[in-house]
Amino acid sequence: EQSENNASQRYDPLRGEMVIKYGRDFLEKYFPLENLNWQSITGFKISDGSFIILKDNIETSLKNKHKFIGHRGDVNNPSAIILKNNNLHIEIIIDPKAFSAQQDSANISDIIVEAAISTICDNEDSVAAVDAEDKIICYKNWLGLMKGDLKSIFKKNGKTYERKLNPDRSYISKDGKKLKLHGRSLLLVRNVGHLMTSPAITLKDGSEIPEGIMDAFITSAACLHDINKKGNSRSGSIYIVKPKMHGPDETSFTDLIFT
């Protein structure tokens, strides 16, 4: 819903008010406070590793203090607060200069919610890669993801935009140490099943290569770029989804391929 006077402008105060209320209700639901509610909050600070929430001169804290993980910026004027619920993080961005914060009593400009903690990159034919040319694009994108240098530059409405992988996010933990969280989903790559073949590579007799074997070798080779730097895997592992295995023989063959 938009107010009639601001429907065509860059920022609509009525919609902004509704978004702010929605954000505060979200915080109230998952991070309730001791004696106050999030709708009335005017500021934040960090004191001796504790997260202090302010309503003017009144101080309070989270009911569950363990949900506070860390912050970014000055302890008396933090620029970000990191909270955690069910092993998922949220980041409260505080930026008085941001256009979106002008209407918020605590200068909250954004609430970033961790989601899609894992993402599957699909190489299956008939879905993402119908022919050899499509397959090359899939492999190229997967290689860029594993190397960390994948980006896309495009024009829209006369402006040039660049999309690239988000860097890791750095904070200060509540015990004063450096805290780093991943800025990207954990990526898995889906290979095809055993029954398909691909014209991308032909064998000596002119027959097409089994596509599952081709996927296994090329996607695994691309992952070698990530094993040591651990930009994707936290443990230096490779994550491959192998679908459509019909019984123990095909499962055993998959095990043979990857070992």
Predicted features, each with a name:
Residues 257-258:
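Subunit-assembly interface segments of extracellular/virion macromolecular structures
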Residues 1-253:
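Catalytic alpha/beta active-site cores
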